[in-house]
Amino acid sequence: MIIKPIGERVLLKHQKKQEVTKGGIYIPESARQEKKEGIVISVGTFEDGKELPLKKGDHVIYGGYQSDEIEIDDEKYIFVDFKDILATIAEE
């Protein structure tokens, strides 16, 4: 299935919450903070038709309160406005 966002939106695969600390301690669901990171699945375009400066596979941090969630094959995906993408994360 191919999903292409319309307008200045980005489809992200939500990064799962950490369930165990690096030291091996289990974090209960009630104490976990929602992680606002995701992997770019597909991107829309600017009004003039130019591509947004993100590509499939980019690891991003996003903010904002406006997002729409969908679930496909038990995986959580999120549509986020491009303006709410704060940064990309790259390995050094």
Swiss-Prot record:
Gene3D superfamilies: GroES chaperonin
Key words of the record: Chaperone, Cytoplasm
Function: Together with the chaperonin GroEL, plays an essential role in assisting protein folding. The GroEL-GroES system forms a nano-cage that allows encapsulation of the non-native substrate proteins and provides a physical environment optimized to promote and accelerate protein folding. GroES binds to the apical surface of the GroEL ring, thereby capping the opening of the GroEL channel.
Record GO biological process: chaperone cofactor-dependent protein refolding
Main localization of the protein described in the UniProt heading: cytoplasm
Listed name of the protein: Co-chaperonin GroES
Family as reported in the entry's similarity comment: Belongs to the GroES chaperonin family.
GO MF, any single term: protein folding chaperone
PROSITE patterns registered for this protein in UniProt: CHAPERONINS_CPN10
Gene: groES
Top-level division of the source organism's lineage: Archaea
Subcellular localization(s) per the UniProt record: Cytoplasm
CC terms in the record's Gene Ontology section: cytoplasm
Subunit composition and interactions: Heptamer of 7 subunits arranged in a ring. Interacts with the chaperonin GroEL.
Source organism (scientific name): Methanosarcina barkeri (strain Fusaro / DSM 804)
